[in-house]
Amino acid sequence: MSRIMIAGTGSGCGKTTIVCGLCQCFKDMGLKTSALKCGPDYIDSMFHSRVLNMRTGNLDSWFCDDETIKYLLARKECESDITIVEGVMGYFDGQGFGTKGSSYDIAGITDTPVILIVNCRGMSNSIGAVIKGYTGYEKDSHIRGVIFNNLSSRLYKDAAQMVKEMGIEPLGYLPYKKEAVLESRHLGLVTSAEVEHFQEKVTCIASQMKETLDIDGILKIAENASE
């Protein structure tokens, strides 16, 4: 059963954009893809549903017990070649200053490998400090790879080498492209129906991913998820 979690360093780092792009990439490859969102957020799930043309869902460890979460995930996996779980907020953010209800909590309950999205805008060497902090914050972070968002091709080689030395797999980068931005507002993302030229933007994101992400590496991590 192939699955991955796409988690981030915080809200606004590009999780939903990257999940939508990956869903489109996998669809283009002929893979039956399903998606789930950590927490009760229904707006991001609407984005997933629009790309995949199917109903998606949520995994919420605040409202559901562990067995229910495992059941909801297994139900999606049974009908898919690959399942993508989108994280919520920052990876370790849960109730207050605890991890209950966090993406990390869901990854632990379901034993799902995690790919961390790092928004690299305004950073260079500090990228390494951020990643080292996230991968070392808990004994087993479940983080198996990193995608660098808003990073130039010029900086990627050094960033990738830095991550490799930490024992984490660099899985590519995405440069900033204005035409691929999914709009947001003060209280978060607009709904998918409010995004102008939504499918064109998702197609643009997926096209960029095919050039600068290690899609095979992402699939390999997903395939190594425990059954």
Where are these regions (language model features)?
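Internal gly/pro-rich beta-alpha loop/helix module
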Residues: 125-227
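Intrinsic structural disorder
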Residues: 1-2, 227
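Residues in flexible loops and secondary-structure boundaries
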Residues: 14, 21, 64-67, 182, ...
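Short hydrophobic alpha-helical runs that function as membrane-insertion/retention elements
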Residues: 114-117, 171-173
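ATP-dependent carboxylate-amine ligase catalytic core
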Residues: 2-13, 17, 23-110, 118-145, ...
